[in-house]
């Protein structure tokens, strides 16, 4: 695969992944409204099941795209480059993440001047901003260890990488899954390391894997096992679909390889997909804001659930694109979003 085609497929991954995340969060946000959940329990269960194959692969694939690009032996990851990547994410947290922390405190407790800002900053340092920003915190950690991982993949064989990836998967994804299902404590730091597995898996998959029977079979088996779990314990099954548990990696690898294999065609320069690709990071960061606003409007909350969720998706994507482009007019944000 040529570099151009590889880049194009990753652009498609960003677009599809961003849209998938917005759809997932529309379901999650509406489920958290008690009156909506009580009146639509069966529909929410069906949506939870559908979200596994349609949306849960998105954030893992984001990590895998980063790993495929940044761990490429042909790419020089100097400390200066790492510093720029880390500063970009830190800037996002110190601005957008901090604003979300302030909004959360004001909505919950009211505004108390400097005390609110101090509490918001402490929450930000502890990772207590809006939940979807865990991805940004994780990227900072991945960028910091990229020089070490990059040096390793330059000398590692395919077998070496496979062993490291499998051991990491066992320790950081399988063990937490056993803990969740059986109530054991095989791995005390539950879920903290799974992004590393996806980061390495992205490089491995981009280098060695094709869309063949093995990849399809492993992904389909993991997906089927996760879906079967809904018949026994829907709440547990929903948790097992998260990236830090064992079912997500095989299916996410399948999604990643499928996108690389099937979506190699370039986007039209002035097309919708290209526009969404340019704004995909902003869409990921900003879309929850619009969902929160919509769910505070009584007239909108009374809409039929699918209509309400579609409204959240459409307004979330469109509003995020507009807000992203407005923020880019400010010099500090121009190269960050």
Regions found by a protein language model. Name each.
Residues 1-169, 300-337:
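Membrane-cytosol interface segments of multi-pass membrane proteins
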Residues 13, 20-23, 61-63, 142, ...:
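Hydrophobic residues within membrane-embedded alpha-helical segments of Major Facilitator Superfamily
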Residues 23-26, 97-98, 165-179, 220-234, ...:
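Aromatic-anchored segments of alpha-helical transmembrane domains
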Residues 47-60, 123-138, 177-198, 229-254:
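Interfacial loop-to-helix transition and helix-capping segments at the boundaries
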Residues 68-76, 147-154, 174, 201-210, ...:
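Structural signal for the C-terminal ends of transmembrane alpha-helices
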Residues 159-208:
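Loop-centered beta-sheet repeat module
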Residues 193, 211-274, 289, 304-306:
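Alpha-helical transmembrane segments and terminal signal-anchor/GPI-anchor hydrophobic tails
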Residues 288-299:
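Transmembrane alpha-helical segments of integral membrane proteins
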């Amino acid at each position: 695969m040529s570099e151009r085609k590889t880049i194009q497929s990753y652009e498609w991954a960003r677009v599809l992944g961003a849209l998938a995340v917005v759809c997932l969060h529309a379901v999650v946000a509406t489920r958290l409204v008690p009156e909506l959940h009580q009146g639509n329990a069966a529909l929410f269960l069906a949506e939870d099941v559908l979200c596994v194959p349609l949306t849960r692969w998105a954030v893992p694939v984001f990590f895998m795209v980063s790993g495929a690009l940044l761990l490429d032996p042909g790419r020089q990851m100097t400390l200066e480059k790492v510093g720029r990547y880390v500063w970009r994410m830190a800037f996002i947290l110190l601005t957008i993440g901090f604003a979300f922390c302030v909004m959360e405190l004001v909505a919950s407790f009211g505004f108390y001047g400097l005390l609110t800002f101090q509490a918001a900053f402490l929450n930000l340092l502890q990772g207590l901003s809006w939940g979807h920003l865990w991805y940004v915190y994780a990227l900072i950690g991945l960028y910091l260890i990229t020089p070490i991982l990059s040096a390793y993949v330059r000398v590692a064989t395919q077998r070496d990488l496979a062993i490291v990836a499998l051991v990491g998967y066992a320790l950081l994804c399988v063990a937490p899954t056993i803990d969740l299902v059986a109530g054991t404590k095989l791995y005390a730091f539950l879920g903290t390391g799974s992004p590393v597995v996806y980061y390495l898996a992205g490089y491995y998959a981009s280098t060695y894997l094709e869309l063949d029977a093995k990849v399809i079979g492993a992904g389909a088996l993991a997906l089927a096992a996760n879906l079967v779990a809904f018949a026994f314990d829907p709440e547990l099954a929903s948790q097992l679909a998260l990236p830090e548990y064992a079912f997500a990696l095989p299916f996410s690898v399948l999604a990643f390889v499928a996108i690389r294999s099937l979506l190699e065609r370039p986007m039209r320069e002035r097309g919708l997909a290209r526009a969404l690709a340019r704004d995909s990071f902003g869409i990921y960061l900003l879309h929850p804001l619009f969902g929160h606003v919509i769910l505070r409007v009584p007239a909108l909350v009374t809409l039929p659930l699918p209509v309400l969720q579609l409204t959240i998706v459409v307004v979330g994507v469109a509003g995020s694109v507009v807000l992203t482009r407005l923020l880019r007019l400010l010099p500090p944000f121009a190269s960050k979003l």
